[in-house]
Every structure is written in structure tokens, then in C-alpha cells.
Regions:
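Ligand-binding loop in jelly-roll beta-barrel domains
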Residues: 87-88, 102-129
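Short histidine-centered beta-strand/loop micro-motifs
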Residues: 60-65, 83, 90, 108-111
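Sec/Tat signal peptide C-region and signal peptidase I cleavage site
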Residues: 17-23
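Short acidic-glycine-tyrosine-enriched beta hairpin
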Residues: 38, 42-43, 52-54, 85-102
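A short glycine-rich, His/Asp/Glu-containing loop-to-beta-strand
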Residues: 25-61, 67, 122
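Short, low-complexity, Pro/Ser/Thr/Gly-rich segments in the mature regions of secreted, periplasmic
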Residues: 130-138
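Glycine- and acidic-residue-biased ligand/ion/polar-headgroup-sensing regions
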Residues: 67-86, 93-95
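Bacterial N-terminal signal peptides
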Residues: 5-16
């Protein structure tokens, strides 16, 4: 149920951006892989999200809930990332980065046009929070 609503939200986000067929073929595949309430932190949950990029793949600019802390680890390949107005950085397999509550993620993309890339984003977020990603306002 959660996975279905998360994926439906991701698809709605993609549709709302007016992506062309070519752009949608480059869109990231996003899968909720786990979700657990934190027993020692009432009202908070930890959610793991696998983000898979094909060659040249990307996610549109986005933000997350104001209560979400995200810690991302690159599992395969290389990820280009820009948080807020900082520089675009490239993270390789085994490297990690974080996003603080309210941060804007302007660039999130595969660093390669020929190889896939994957990252695991771990969210600490309000348990009642269902949507994890919102498009950046243009």
C-alpha cells in the first residue's frame, strides 16, 4: 500500500513536470524498500528509498518535507548532486551525503551517460508523512 502510493506520487510528479517520452525514459526509478516507526522517538519513522538511475538518468529538482532529514549513500556508479546553492558535487559508490530539513535538491543525476547508478536515501521523518518528495517551484 505504502509502496503503491509512493510510486503513484512519483509518477504524478513526473506527469506534472510535463516530461517528454525521452525525458521520462531517463527518469529515476524510485522504490520504498523499508519503513519502520522509531520506538524511542515517538512520531518519527525511518524510511529507506532506493533510487535507480539508468545511463544519463536524473530526478527533477525537488525538496522534501520540512521535518525530513535524509542521509544518502551511493551504492553503484556515480551521482551528481547539488543541495541548495552549493556546488554540484559527484559522489561515487561508497560515498554519502546528507540533506537537512528544508533543503532544496536542485541536481540529482547519474554521473555517467553509459553506466547505471543507484543510491539508498534514508529518511528520518514524521510517521504520518506519506509524500517524501515535492517538485521545486519554478
Amino acid at each position: 500500500m505504502i509502496r503503491t502510493s509512493f510510486l503513484a506520487g512519483a509518477l504524478a510528479l513526473l506527469a506534472a513536470t510535463g516530461a517528454s517520452a525521452d525525458e521520462s525514459s531517463k527518469a529515476a526509478k524510485v522504490t520504498l524498500v523499508y519503513e519502520h516507526e522509531l520506538p524511542n522517538v515517538p512520531g518519527k519513522s525511518i524510511k529507506g528509498v532506493l533510487v535507480e538511475y539508468g545511463p544519463g538518468g536524473f530526478s527533477d529538482g525537488h525538496t522534501h518535507p520540512d521535518t525530513a532529514f535524509i542521509y544518502a549513500t551511493v551504492l553503484e556508479g556515480a551521482i551528481r548532486s547539488q543541495v541548495n546553492d552549493g556546488p554540484v558535487k559527484v559522489y561515487h559508490a561508497g560515498e554519502s551525503f546528507s540533506e537537512m530539513p528544508g533543503d532544496r535538491h536542485g541536481v540529482s543525476a547519474n554521473g555517467s551517460e553509459t553506466k547505471p547508478a543507484r543510491l539508498l536515501a534514508v529518511f528520518v521523518v514524521d510517521t504520518k508523512q506519506k509524500e517524501l518528495t515535492y517538485p521545486l517551484k519554478k
